[in-house]
Amino acid sequence: MVNIGTHVSSSKSLDLVFERGKEVEASSIQFFIRSPRSWAWIERTDEEKERFLQKKNEYKIHPLVVHASYLFNLASFEEELYKKSIESVIQELKLCEELKIDYYVIHAGKSKGNPKKQAIDRILRAFEEIFSRLNLKNTTFLVETLAGQSGEVGATLEEVYTLIEPFENEKIGVCLDTCHIFASGYQINTDEGFNSFKKELIDYNLLEKTKVIHCNDSKAPFNSKKDRHEHIGKGFIGLEGFRIFLNDDDFNKLPFILETPKEGDMDRVNINLLKSLIK
């Protein structure tokens, strides 16, 4: 059985993510542990953490994935933002460890017009500091593939490899996003394009490092460098692209987590549609 889940709200109390996942029949869930568009940090009470861990055992939804705030930029050339991003990532990862979260997914950073090589060097220094200050035991740090807008680092598999290769002894891996890789120039919705993408993933030794797939169609066309998520089958990737992924013997062992627009009962609709594509 392929594991298909979705991103859920963690508003009001973190432990409510389990009920919200169950409501849409999600096998796995992803959520934020702070507002994705605010630097504000809420200290969680011991009672809230205990409720979360109790429900984790009760609901058996697995894996649990936390997505980093969108405000972080570990490639920033603005020193204040750079340091604030590092400290905030560490803050989030400490809570992930306490809550026994399986995976922490992050957009590594944006160069925003600055030289890409220097941006990569700044991300590597940030990663080095993060890993030197934490001893991750429960949570694996995942670098997400990105679409390439605003000088995003991680829009090619070569860049992703460059970011994680120096830390092979750490708990680090990859999160593939179908919308992002399609928008960045990998034509994953044809057999030829998918096979070419998978070969490159293997060549960079990233297939075995891939732990989570963000399952999103794309509102923007192939190679657009635009990050615009769409409901499954309603975008430029189309059903065939997801059918190929879901029936691949390597990828169908991984969790497929939706990040599609939150509209009515569309999470349940998208989950059931993905299930229908499995042979």
UniProtKB/Swiss-Prot annotation:
Alphabetized UniProt keyword annotations: DNA damage, DNA repair, Endonuclease, Hydrolase, Metal-binding, Nuclease, Zinc
Catalytic reaction(s) noted: Endonucleolytic cleavage to 5'-phosphooligonucleotide end-products
EC number(s) on file: 3.1.21.2
A Pfam family that the UniProt record links to this protein: AP_endonuc_2
SUPFAM superfamilies, per the entry: Xylose isomerase-like (SSF51658)
Residues the entry annotates as binding Zn(2+) 3: H180, D227, H229
Molecular-function GO terms, alphabetical: deoxyribonuclease IV (phage-T4-induced) activity; DNA binding; DNA-(apurinic or apyrimidinic site) endonuclease activity; phosphoric diester hydrolase activity; zinc ion binding
Chain positions recorded as Zn(2+) 2 binding sites: E144, D177, H214, E259
Family matches, as InterPro entries: AP_endonuc_2, AP_endonuc_F2_Zn_BS, Xyl_isomerase-like_sf, Xyl_isomerase-like_TIM-brl
Cofactor list: Zn(2+)
Enzyme class: hydrolase
PROSITE patterns linked: AP_NUCLEASE_F2_2 (PS00730), AP_NUCLEASE_F2_3 (PS00731), AP_NUCLEASE_F2_4 (PS51432)
Residues at which Zn(2+) 1 binds: H67, H107, E144
NCBIfam families, A to Z: nfo
Protein's recorded name: Probable endonuclease 4
